[in-house]
Amino acid sequence: MPKFAANLTMMFNEVPFLDRFEAAAKAGFKYVEFLWPYDYPAQELKAILDKHGLKVVLFNTPAGDVNKGEWGGSAIPGREADSHRDIDLALEYALALGCPNVHIMSAVVPEGASREEYKQTFIKNVRYASDKYKPYGIKIQLEALSPEVKPNYLLKSQFDTLEVVELVDRDNVFVQLDYFHAQNVDGNLARLTDKLNGKFAHVQIASVPDRHEPDEGEINYQYIFDKLDEIGYTGYVGCEYKPRGETVTGLDWFQKYK
């Protein structure tokens, strides 16, 4: 049975971020994920996690200057020092929070820039992260973002991500399989799951096309959950969706998994 993690950046947004941990626990979640923890001291977050009996299972490296169109910086040529700083900061938080996975964000590729140069820069920075994280058993996740959500992102398809994972060639670097993005770009999710089996170590879900609860839209998530059980997937399933209304009202789908 899947181990579901509430995404606290997107869910329970009826209350401030630090109050979402309690809300998730009351709703029956044992695991949480979020995009970025860096606005808060790690020890404060750890105390809140412990208070509510929660485990954080994933967060991202810093996004960079979002106001300038950045969305990650680990693929930007000439910014390797910044990338290493972000990777090191994420490691500090992962160790303090006991988080087993970190998503290393690549970057948006500007019009006219060389995607190959960005890719090679990303590969080098991910190898740096791999060496830093390996002694602690922390897994590195790389994620494709569909063009509808993030135009010109370096990784668009699950196969873009798989290519980078294979070129990095380290045993602690994996595909982060977000079925929302995968359906938008790749489709054929059952066969995709088989093709990526053993290469992905974190899953995220949301309906397509509206990115709501996983009980509507194009994807038959019960089939996907059964497929994950069939292949022996033991990682976490992050609920990275935008609730249709109040978060708790939309959790009927989750009741049988508590």
From Swiss-Prot:
PANTHER family in the cross-refs: HYDROXYPYRUVATE ISOMERASE-RELATED (PTHR43489:SF6), ISOMERASE (PTHR43489)
Protein name (database record): 2-oxo-tetronate isomerase
Top EC class, one word: isomerase
EC numbers on record: 5.3.1.35
Function field: Catalyzes the isomerization of 2-oxo-tetronate to 3-oxo-tetronate.
UniProt-listed InterPro entries: HPT_OtnI_isomerases, HyI-like, Sugar_Epim/Isomerase, Xyl_isomerase-like_sf, Xyl_isomerase-like_TIM-brl
GO biological process, one term: glyoxylate metabolic process
Gene from which this protein is expressed: otnI
Family: Belongs to the hyi family. OtnI subfamily.
Active site as annotated: 143, 240
Catalytic activity: 2-dehydro-L-erythronate = 3-dehydro-L-erythronate; 2-dehydro-D-erythronate = 3-dehydro-D-erythronate
Entry GO MF terms: hydroxypyruvate isomerase activity; metal ion binding
Binding site for Mg(2+): 143, 178, 204, 240
UniProt entry keywords in alphabetical sequence: Carbohydrate metabolism, Isomerase, Magnesium, Metal-binding
